[in-house]
Amino acid sequence: MAGNRTNDVTVHCSFCGKNQDEVKKIIAGNGVFICNECVELSQEIIREELAEEVLADLSEVPKPKELLAILDSYVIGQDRAKRALAVAVYNHYKRISFTESQDDQDVDLQKSNILMIGPTGSGKTFLAQTLAKSLNVPFAIADATALTEAGYVGEDVENILLKLIQAADYNVERAERGIIYVDEIDKIAKKGENVSITRDVSGEGVQQALLKIIEGTVASVPPQGGRKHPQQEMIQIDTKNILFIVGGAFDGIEDIVKQRLGEKIIGFGQNNKKIDDQSSYMQEIISEDIQKFGLIPEFIGRLPVLAALEQLTVDDLVKILTEPKNALVKQYQTLLSYDGVELEFDQEALQAIAQKAIERKTGARGLRSIIEETMLDLMFEIPSQEDVTCVRITKKAVEGTDKPILETAS
């Protein structure tokens, strides 16, 4: 074979001693030779060592109180949801650590995937991202509305796994301990409780396809994404230890809860349980309500941990703007500091930003765009105005009826 002989001299692998006739390939280096078998062996050793490093990391998972403290430093409000997530994530990685360190297990511990229900902008995606970052595990986000069942135009569910593998730099062992967040899961609910005679391409069929990878299976993933074809090489990944967090707004589910609790939406009825505000209905959601909304029982059964998030108030949004480690106000203050300019927000300005986000029904995710709108002209002009030392954002500036106040050195 080409490259195995040097001027008809017998070449031996410097590591195992085999000659070129005993192996498929020998690669020449600077005074050394290595055969294909030793290359494969070294790759296997590296893979095993990396897998052991992953397992060692899992044995040091922060306890629920420690995870909650991490979430508290980045996420405002949603205390009940954060507690539920902290416990579920700790139990998940504790299960992996102990199961894989002990060969003989009397009890088969099932994993506890998570369903998050809450309005747009309430922090579902950010909570999942923060957990993955704090644990230093691969993380991927998928949009359920882009998925279709096999045989239809759209994205196969296996492509979700490819995103996780890519996040792990194609280290499959590390990806197998990662976290996947599937957003907009409510958008693939069945259209009503009665099964249609037509194919529900983006509904029950997608739930069934997701169910397989969520509950745990060895999946074949196309390394370049897209649809599978017979000649394509596949990446094999075991999903039994991947934590799946799915989330959605589930608009209208509070009405299902009201009906179950005996409170009529129209007319009169006897209240079996008095609930004071809409956000409290979210804390009363049970699997029966989710099934009535349109998720199939088998799918719900693989998501035993329910974390309900509440609508954020003006006060919550103001705290989000100012208090977390990576608060938006701190980010923009840092940006302007690079130009030697201080940035201040009046309290009324912060409240006006929060109020706009609520009116637009964008929640926390809409805060940045509102600040960008308010500060666009300012950030365009400031770099060219060397005499400006401080900028103050007022309520009128947020409302668009006046400009921010500039202070100069003179």
From Swiss-Prot:
Residues holding ATP: P119, T120, G121, S122, G123, K124, T125, F126
Family annotation (Gene3D superfamilies): 1.10.8.60, ClpX chaperone, C4-type zinc finger domain, P-loop containing nucleotide triphosphate hydrolases
GO MF annotation terms: ATP binding; ATP hydrolysis activity; ATP-dependent protein folding chaperone; protein dimerization activity; unfolded protein binding; zinc ion binding
Any single Gene Ontology cellular-component annotation: HslUV protease complex
KW ATP-binding (keyword) present: yes
Listed GO biological process terms: cell division; proteolysis involved in protein catabolic process
Keyword Secreted attributed: no
Domain ClpX-type ZB intervals: 1-54
Binding residues annotated for Zn(2+), in chain numbering: C13, C16, C35, C38
Keywords tagged on the record: ATP-binding, Chaperone, Metal-binding, Nucleotide-binding, Zinc
Family to which this protein belongs: Belongs to the ClpX chaperone family.
Subunit structure: Component of the ClpX-ClpP complex. Forms a hexameric ring that, in the presence of ATP, binds to fourteen ClpP subunits assembled into a disk-like structure with a central cavity, resembling the structure of eukaryotic proteasomes.
Physiological role: ATP-dependent specificity component of the Clp protease. It directs the protease to specific substrates. Can perform chaperone functions in the absence of ClpP.
Protein name: ATP-dependent Clp protease ATP-binding subunit ClpX
Organism (species): Streptococcus mutans serotype c (strain ATCC 700610 / UA159)
Gene: clpX
